[in-house]
Amino acid sequence: GFIHADFTHLFFNLFSFFFFGVQLEQIFNQLFPSIASELYILFYVLAIVVADLPTFFKQKNNPNYNSLGASGAVSAVIFAGILFFPTEKIYLFGFFGIPGFIYAGLFTWYSVEMDKRSRDFVNHSAHLYGALFGIVAMTLLYPQVWISFVEQITAMLR
């Protein structure tokens, strides 16, 4: 989770983590003020582990398989943030903005499709399971997030 294949891989993870991580850290500070830092670090480290577990079990007997990066944990941070701000625009390629909940659907679809093909040496299932971890963890930590999630999307669609 802390080693990356190359500078580009590291850059995109850090870039994404910076923008979404700061926002999620602020949410943790508001919701859990006395333990926010510890809980946030625990959330991130658990996301690294949980996101890679399915791949570990799938590939445990394959000595040629390698997986690097923190993309699963970054996906957890992004999806946890989307739960709180589903209508905030996420800009693809710097200029094409789409609401977070639509991005989440597209990202999930892309990760599932690419994982089926798995020809590009990217651990797409880590992205998928990291995203799932972010959703499940935030639901367990703050179940009320779903009320706000639905209200924001409903208000946007009016």
Give the ranges of each region predicted by the language model.
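A detector for small-residue-rich transmembrane helices and their helix-helix packing motifs
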Residues: G1-R158
